[in-house]
């Protein structure tokens, strides 16, 4: 109520992507295909983990939550982008804009925490294989997931409430394809220093520290594997960490660059491209990087298909 009492505008205008009119249809088809790939890939992972008891392990508990987070993360922004591209109506109500920002932060933060949990799970599995079951107990894993949801909900609500207290005057044009927090702060006509300090401090806790923990976990994994100096060991280290670290670097690199270390001469096009990387590309790649190409998931898919063909097959 506070935000609505102080603001003199009822909606914002999302400029969307800087593309030419003749490219609209092609871009619409491309983003629709990427969004459907994200939905189907992540839904398949969730269903397989739910149906196959062989996948009821800590790693796949984290993976199922990551897939749900990716699915929701993309669904917060991409449907509105597709709607605007199709209808040529860039407006979004004030309340809807804050709601979109809230859930964007929630699921983005949740992904950050889950990536840390997955890195720690791999660290324990490779460096302490004999103690894996004792360390990664069901209670610990469920507690980590529950705590991640609580912390991300609190963080998203904090930023939403701080944004709602700001005044927005004449300028309501957001040069972005979603209600980005930094873009909204630039439109505010009241003091935003508190918001900026909270972004910097909480961003360090939510983004930078998890990123460093992930790098530390994978560094220990590589160090542990390379203690056996063999070509096979090196290949195993690279296959274990290389693809995972590429997605982690893509996600955290763009987030840190956009929100914690913004460039003074940063252009709207550059910011939009960087945002597309972690809102569209990363959620689409995660199912392929983390799950769909490994033997456990392929085996689970085969077992589920066989059970559907022969219900009496155990």
UniProtKB/Swiss-Prot annotation:
Keyword Hydrolase tagged: no
Q: Which residues form a coiled coil?
A: none
Principal localisation: membrane
Which InterPro entries does the UniProt entry name for this protein? GPCR_Rhodpsn, GPCR_Rhodpsn_7TM, Olfact_rcpt
Gene Ontology CC entries for this record: plasma membrane
UniProt GO BP: signal transduction
Residue spans, topological domain Extracellular: 1-25, 80-100, 159-196, 261-272
Q: Which residues lie on this side of the membrane: Cytoplasmic?
A: 50-57, 121-139, 220-236, 293-314
Q: Where in the cell is it found?
A: Cell membrane
Annotated Gene3D superfamilies: Rhodopsin 7-helix transmembrane proteins (1.20.1070.10)
Recorded GO molecular functions are: G protein-coupled receptor activity; olfactory receptor activity
What functional role does this protein have?
Odorant receptor.
For this chain, the family text in UniProt reads:
Belongs to the G-protein coupled receptor 1 family.
Q: Per its record, how is this protein called by name?
A: Olfactory receptor 1E2
Q: Which organism is it from?
A: Pan troglodytes (Chimpanzee)
């Amino acid at each position: 109520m506070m935000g609505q009492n102080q603001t003199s505008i009822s909606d914002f205008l999302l400029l969307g992507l800087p593309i030419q009119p003749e490219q609209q249809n092609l871009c619409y088809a491309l983003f629709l295909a990427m969004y459907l790939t994200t939905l189907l890939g992540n839904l398949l992972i969730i269903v397989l983990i739910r149906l196959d008891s062989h996948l009821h392990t800590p790693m796949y508990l984290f993976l199922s939550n990551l897939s749900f987070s990716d699915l929701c993360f993309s669904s917060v922004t991409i449907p509105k982008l597709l709607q605007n591209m199709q209808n040529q109506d860039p407006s979004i109500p004030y309340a809807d804009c804050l709601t979109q920002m809230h859930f964007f932060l929630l699921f983005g933060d949740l992904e950050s925490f889950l990536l840390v949990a997955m890195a720690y799970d791999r660290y324990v599995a490779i460096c302490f294989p004999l103690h894996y079951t004792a360390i990664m107990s069901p209670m610990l894993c469920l507690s980590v997931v529950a705590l991640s949801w609580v912390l991300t909900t609190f963080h998203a609500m904090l930023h939403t409430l701080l944004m709602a207290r700001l005044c927005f005057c004449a300028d309501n044009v957001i040069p972005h394809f979603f209600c980005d927090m930094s873009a909204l702060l630039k439109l505010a006509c009241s003091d935003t220093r508190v918001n900026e300090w909270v972004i910097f401090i909480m961003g360090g806790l939510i983004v930078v520290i998890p990123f460093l923990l992930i790098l530390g976990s994978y560094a220990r994994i590589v160090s542990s594997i390379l203690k056996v100096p063999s070509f096979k060991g090196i290949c195993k280290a690279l296959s274990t960490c290389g693809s995972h670290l590429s997605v982690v670097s893509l996600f955290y690199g763009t987030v840190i660059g956009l929100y914690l270390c913004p460039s003074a001469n940063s252009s709207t096009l550059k910011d939009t491209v960087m945002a597309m990387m972690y809102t569209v590309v990363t959620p689409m790649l995660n199912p392929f990087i983390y799950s769909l190409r490994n033997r456990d998931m392929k085996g689970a898919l085969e077992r589920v298909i066989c059970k559907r063909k022969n219900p009496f097959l155990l």
